Amino acid sequence: MENRWQVMIVWQVDRMRIKTWNSLVKHHMYVSKKAKKWVYRHHYESTNPKTSSEVHIPVGDARLVITTYWGLHTGERDWHLGHGVSIEWRQERYSTQIDPDLADQLIHLHYFDCFSDSAIRKAILGHRVSPICDYQAGHRKVGSLQYLALTALISPKRTKPPLPSVRKLVEDRWNKPQKTRGHRGSHTMNGH
């Protein structure tokens, strides 16, 4: 019998991002209770030796599964040390992989307080408006003029620690161009 391959999209991330993600998830599951329906699975609960952790996030009838991996082949760069993340949408027997932006939007819609477009209607009707959006990563579009005016009038408060963002987890912080200090550049580059 032939080998059967299954291809998955795994986002290469650095180990410290995974550590930060896991600690934020646990904080919001056990301390702030904003993610109390989420399920965290340790590496020893998985049959796959490459799985370091799994977070199951119920989203309506379905669930998001964010799986972190270790011991993968290293990447092209020295800092790609074999750690990765996959993001999967599962509903009954159907599953598909999704990108980090969509995962953030789904989490945002189902779990966190949001100062959204409904605030405009409430303000016009004279109702009290809550100026909070706990999950700014879920907002990708530019708001309407009324929405922008309301956000300028009532500034949202920041939560500490921040809520876990899948987009932030898979963000490539290594390949961004480095900013040098001042107009003369760095001291080591120009020999002073």
UniProtKB/Swiss-Prot annotation:
Residues 151-180 are annotated as: SOCS box-like. It comes from Human immunodeficiency virus type 1 group M subtype H (isolate VI991). GO terms for molecular function: metal ion binding; RNA binding. The record marks L150, T151 as: Cleavage in virion (by viral protease). Residues 171-172 are annotated as: Membrane association. This is Virion infectivity factor. Residues 75-114 are annotated as: RNA-binding. Zn(2+) binds at H108, C114, C133, H139. It holds the Pfam family Vif. The modification Phosphothreonine is found at T96, T188. The keyword Magnesium does not apply. Belongs to the primate lentivirus group Vif protein family.
